[in-house]
């Protein structure tokens, strides 16, 4: 049973689909998902399983779903669709510019292009209010107060008052109201400004009362930000606002862009950030006093813990350290207890995952030297010191305090869940005791908390969103060490783990409700499919099978495992046809990039055009084996480590599979491109290679600036993906030994280089440098440069062109094919 909405015309069909599991109602009875065609056309399905009815829409976004209704917007047509599940009706509201659905009050508020604002009961269709000449509208955080910003007058509606009171403001003292802050449990304040003053009004039973006025220009030369986007209440009496620097700084002269060696940062980028940076102001509405925390010439960031009435601040670029993605920060604390005076806490790593607070907790949490800590007035407490678990990726050199850690999640207000490499650790903030919550390492499992199980609170002036488990149970997704099996498990209020789903596939896009879970499963031989299951795991059903035309997938993927001479465990994926001919040898392509075993069950449509590597389906169907080894790193450096890993993998795989050793190709993109560049400079095992967007000279890359972000690439070399563990000048020999360009004379493998001429993530001149070095050395090298393309080719024609050329390159060298015309 289907309801179809009219469309303007037929959309060209393309068989390849991307499946997205979008929404699930709280009662689990309504599921919303969509598929995206190759031409970006979106087909949206809302399935009411309780009433056995499907609703089909096209190109909707900004979607909302509850137990009773669905809303979605077609922005191109300016249509708003409202589905009432009880009445089984679909209503279309046209010419909608903006909408808000207040489910608690059963009210739909929407604005039209004609500056009209309608308030309706969408279930009955009854129009409650119509306002004309309204520029915009805004709701309070709790959706109880509506501010209508008019050309002539402002109107305030209180949806929770007994009389649904309406306040009309004609005389605004040349003030335009722009912002509502607060809630019913605290207070409602209305903010606006004249040409030179900030005005704050407080809502009272009979209207608004002006409670605060202040000049926009402040005593430290800064000015109040009148957009009011960074405005919030700490409590009823403390209002947080933003200020901006009083004047615009300039890092350029009439003839030159000025870079100052003494600046903490790249001068033009620093100036741009400081001109846009907002610093915190605090207005005490009780004492009618403004606290101006502005520091001129500084890039200051803040974190406000609203419930605890605490402010943390730090100078973002104080420690000018390009060796880290997130330089250290020196953190200070302000609180009402100490009259908002600044108190230093300590120096921490500046990763947004490393330092955080929860509004429900008085503690500051931070990660330092392998362990999690919390800080309060009594000092610091180590949370995980006694845990038999690793909370960081030990493979990264000097990375114990940086980005590759997972954020803690608050659980039942008084407990903290911390994800380790395989396990989940529980710390009780009330008893200050920790324990293993889920021990994945015992069962060859790696557990992660399902994102949809986490409620994220976002407010202005926070380090990052406040993460808390939504509900009393914890849903976990797991995979085994080979990624050949994945599943879903739940930990109930009794703290007992129970498996719900286990599949030979890859699970993603998990949505949860009170009693139903929806999720997508895919495999190398099965296109993504949407399933639902109840929390007992007993009732499971297929909701939608994407790419249903793709049924004859005659390939297999296997994990090859071994121990090297040092007793270290190693792995590689081998992909092949299911019906290899006995006695026949097959050309092979080795695809490299970090760890590949996690891609075991990744589905690839044969229609996917891949320009930054290969579509393994198509190459297998064309008679190749595809080998994807895990790369492991040691102190010798990333290039040398990659050679060891690939050589070991090939020796193992060649003894198990019918590999034509005389016809093996190598390919990689980005970091895989670097690995490809280096590997062929150290071995003649490969007959040909394709490298896209790769680094060739670590020395020059260390000194390169990303022109898009205006951030130097040093951090990527020292402590991130290149894992060098030292800078260029202290470790010059190591940089030299891991730079492909230094071994151009050794390369005997024909190489195809690919880059986009707007790529500054890996500067495209790295490919040019390798091309010139190989050309100078008289080697076989060709290069494809695509104008206007970045790190990944996005233009459809360019993607197909690169994909076709890569295919013809491998056919020519590995299968004795005809020489391509473009060569």
Predicted feature residues:
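Beta-propeller blade signature
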Residues: 165-172, 212-217, 277-285, 327-338, ...
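Non-catalytic accessory segments flanking enzyme active sites
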Residues: 278-279, 446-468, 477-489, 495-580, ...
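Active-site-proximal cap/loop segments of hydrolase catalytic domains
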Residues: 609-823
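Short, solvent-exposed loop/turn segments at conserved positions within beta-propeller repeat blades
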Residues: 37-41, 74-77, 112-115, 156-165, ...
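Predominantly five- to eight-bladed beta-propeller fold
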Residues: 153-166, 219, 230-232, 242-290, ...
């Amino acid at each position: 049973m289907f309801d179809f909405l009219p469309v303007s015309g037929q959309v060209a069909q393309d068989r390849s689909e991307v499946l997205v599991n979008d929404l699930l109602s709280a009662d689990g009875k309504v599921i919303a998902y969509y598929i995206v065609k190759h031409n970006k056309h979106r087909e949206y399905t809302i399935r009411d399983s309780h009433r056995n009815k499907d609703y089909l829409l096209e190109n909707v976004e900004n979607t909302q779903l509850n137990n009773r209704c669905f809303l979605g917007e077609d922005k191109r047509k300016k249509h708003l669709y409202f589905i009432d599940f009880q009445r089984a009706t679909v209503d279309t509201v046209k010419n909608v510019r903006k909408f808000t659905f207040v489910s608690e009050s059963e009210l739909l508020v929407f604005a039209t292009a004609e500056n009209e604002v309608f308030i309706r009961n969408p279930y009955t269709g009854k129009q409650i209010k119509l306002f004309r000449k309204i520029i915009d509208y805004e709701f309070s955080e709790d959706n109880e107060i509506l501010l209508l910003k008019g050309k002539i007058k402002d109107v305030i509606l209180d949806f929770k008052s007994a009389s649904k009171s309406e306040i009309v403001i004609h005389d605004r003292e040349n003030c335009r109201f722009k912002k509502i802050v607060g809630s019913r449990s605290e207070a409602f304040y209305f903010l606006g400004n004249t040409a030179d003053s900030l005005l704050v009004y407080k809502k009272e039973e009979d209207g608004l009362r002006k409670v605060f006025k202040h000049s926009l220009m402040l005593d430290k030369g800064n000015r109040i930000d009148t957009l009011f986007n960074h405005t919030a209440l700490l409590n009823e009496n403390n209002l947080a606002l933003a200020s901006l620097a009083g004047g615009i700084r300039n890092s350029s002269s009439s003839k030159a862009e000025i870079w100052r060696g003494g600046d903490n940062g790249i001068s033009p980028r620093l100036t741009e950030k400081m001109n846009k940076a907002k610093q915190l102001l605090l207005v005490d509405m009780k004492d009618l006093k403004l606290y101006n925390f502005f520091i001129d010439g500084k890039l200051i960031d803040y974190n406000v813990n609203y419930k605890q009435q605490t402010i943390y601040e730090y100078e973002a670029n104080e420690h000018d350290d390009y060796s880290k993605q997130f330089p250290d920060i020196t953190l200070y604390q302000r609180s009402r207890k100490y009259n908002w005076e600044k108190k230093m806490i300590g120096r921490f790593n500046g990763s947004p995952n490393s330092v955080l607070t929860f509004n429900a907790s008085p503690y500051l949490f931070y990660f330092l030297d392998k362990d999690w800590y919390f800080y309060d007035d009594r000092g610091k407490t180590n949370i995980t010191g006694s845990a038999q678990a690793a909370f960081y990726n030990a493979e990264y050199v000097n990375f114990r305090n940086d980005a590759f850690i997972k954020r803690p999640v608050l659980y039942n207000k008084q407990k903290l869940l911390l994800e380790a490499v395989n396990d989940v650790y529980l710390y009780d903030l009330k008893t200050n005791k920790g324990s293993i919550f889920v021990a994945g390492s015992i069962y060859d499992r790696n557990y992660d908390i399902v994102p949809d199980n986490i409620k994220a609170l976002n407010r202005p002036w926070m380090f990052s969103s406040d993460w808390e488990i939504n509900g009393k149970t914890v849903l976990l997704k797991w995979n085994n060490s080979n990624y050949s099996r994945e599943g879903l498990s739940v930990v109930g209020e009794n703290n007992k783990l129970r498996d719900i789903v286990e599949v030979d596939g890859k699970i993603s896009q998990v949505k949860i409700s009170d009693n139903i879970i929806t999720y997508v499963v895919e495999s190398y031989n099965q296109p993504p499919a949407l399933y639902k299951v109840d929390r007992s795991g007993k009732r499971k059903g297929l909701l939608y099978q994407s790419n249903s035309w793709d049924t004859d997938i005659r390939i297999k993927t296997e994990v090859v495992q071994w121990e090297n001479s040092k007793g270290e465990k190693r792995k590689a994926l081998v992909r092949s046809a299911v019906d290899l001919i006995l006695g026949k040898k097959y050309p092979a392509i080795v695809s490299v990039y970090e760890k590949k075993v996690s891609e075991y069950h990744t589905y690839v449509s044969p229609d996917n055009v891949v320009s930054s590597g290969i579509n393994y389906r198509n190459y297998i169907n064309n008679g190749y084996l595809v080998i994807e080894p895990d790369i492991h790193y040691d102190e010798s450096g990333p290039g040398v480590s990659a050679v060891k890993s690939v050589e070991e993998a090939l020796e193992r795989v060649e003894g198990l599979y019918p590999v034509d050793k005389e016809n093996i190709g190598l390919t990689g993109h980005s970091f895989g491109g670097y690995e490809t560049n280096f590997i062929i400079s150290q071995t003649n095992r490969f007959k040909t290679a394709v490298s896209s967007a790769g680094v060739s000279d670590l020395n020059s890359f260390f000194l390169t600036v990303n022109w898009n972000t205006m951030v130097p690439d040093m951090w990527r070399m020292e402590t991130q993906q290149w894992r060098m563990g030292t800078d260029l000048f202290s470790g010059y020999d190591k940089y030299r030994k891991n730079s492909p360009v230094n071994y151009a004379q050794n390369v005997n493998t024909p190489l195809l280089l690919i880059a986009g001429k707007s790529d500054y993530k890996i500067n495209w001149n790295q490919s040019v440098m390798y091309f010139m070095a190989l050309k100078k050395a008289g080697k076989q090298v060709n290069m494809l440069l695509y104008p206007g393309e970045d790190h990944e080719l996005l233009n459809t024609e360019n993607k197909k062109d690169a994909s076709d050329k890569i295919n013809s390159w491998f056919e020519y060298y590995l299968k004795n094919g005809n020489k391509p015309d473009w060569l």
